[in-house]
Swiss-Prot record:
Location in or out of the cell: Mitochondrion membrane
Broadest EC class assigned to this enzyme: translocase
Gene: ND6
GO cellular component: mitochondrial membrane
Its membrane topology: Multi-pass membrane protein
Principal location: mitochondrion
Name of protein: NADH-ubiquinone oxidoreductase chain 6
Catalytic activity: a ubiquinone + NADH + 5 H(+)(in) = a ubiquinol + NAD(+) + 4 H(+)(out)
Length: 260
């Protein structure tokens, strides 16, 4: 119950800060509200159990992009805009776009099941399903390939002879119990205890199955970094540079000479 209240509070705070981004006259205040939006969304993701994306929000958006925007705006001499007719002229267009977005959101929510709405599309048909999003009074049919709470994966259900996976309405001691429906129409009960986090399962996937792609991407980034450094280096050989060793060996007699 406390989790639901915290989720609602952070969602409303994120909506309020989002409105204040466009309502603030001072651009510095707008960027500060943008940072607050990212922080509130981070707390929402942590409550939903998606801690890896929450960390990415803090590191990338808050720690890099938003702070960069803040310093750029503070360095530039931007005048504070007044709320005049030019500002209010764009209110109808903003309301129209917001209405279209909300209509699509509610249509998506009411046309899909709870698992499909809160399930995070992960990779090649995998769905990340958080235990908060599951309605334990029902049994949901989940698409092939499953990542429950970012923890366990059925890599290829068709090869295992499995048509569908049913999540039973049993939740006890941090364990999920799944009914697996086989092609032979027989049903087995699997008691699966999940202890890994989203970050651990992502690290396992990256460094186990996609480690070669990960290394190739790292080498490409390294080459691009070295190439950018080489491009900005000054290759002019006529530039006079100091020789620290020769300067250290000089004394007063060899440095100063008197001429008539």
């Amino acid at each position: 119950m406390l989790t639901n209240y915290l989720l609602i509070i952070f969602c409303f705070l994120a909506l309020f800060c989002s409105f204040m981004i466009i309502a603030s006259k001072n651009p510095i205040h707008s960027i500060l509200y943008l940072i607050l939006v990212f922080c509130n969304v981070t707390f929402v993701l942590i409550i939903l159990g998606v801690e890896f994306i929450a960390i990415i929000f803090l590191i990338v958006y808050v720690g890099a992009i938003a702070v960069l925007f803040l310093f750029v705006v503070m360095m530039l001499n931007i005048k504070i805009l007044e709320l005049d007719e030019v500002f209010w002229r764009y209110i109808p267009a903003g309301l129209l776009i917001s209405s279209c977005f909300l209509f699509q959101l509610f249509t998506f929510v009411f046309n899909f099941s709870v698992v499909e709405v809160f399930g995070l599309f992960f990779y090649n048909g995998f769905y990340s399903i958080n235990k908060l999003a599951l309605n334990f009074s029902e049994i949901h049919t989940v698409p092939s390939g499953l990542l429950i709470n970012g923890i366990y994966i059925f890599p290829n259900l068709s090869n295992l002879g499995i048509d569908q996976v049913f999540i039973n309405s049993i939740y006890k001691e941090e364990s999920f119990f799944c009914f697996v429906k086989l092609n032979e129409a027989s049903t087995n009960l699997l008691g699966l205890s999940f202890e890994l986090t989203n970050t651990e399962i992502l690290g396992w996937l990256v460094y186990t199955y996609t480690f070669f792609i990960f290394l190739v991407v790292s080498l490409i980034l390294l080459i691009s970094m070295i190439g950018s450094i080489i491009l900005v280096l000054n290759q002019n050989i006529n530039i006079k540079r100091q020789v620290i060793f020769r300067q250290s060996l000089r004394d007063l007699k060899s440095s100063v000479s008197l001429k008539n």
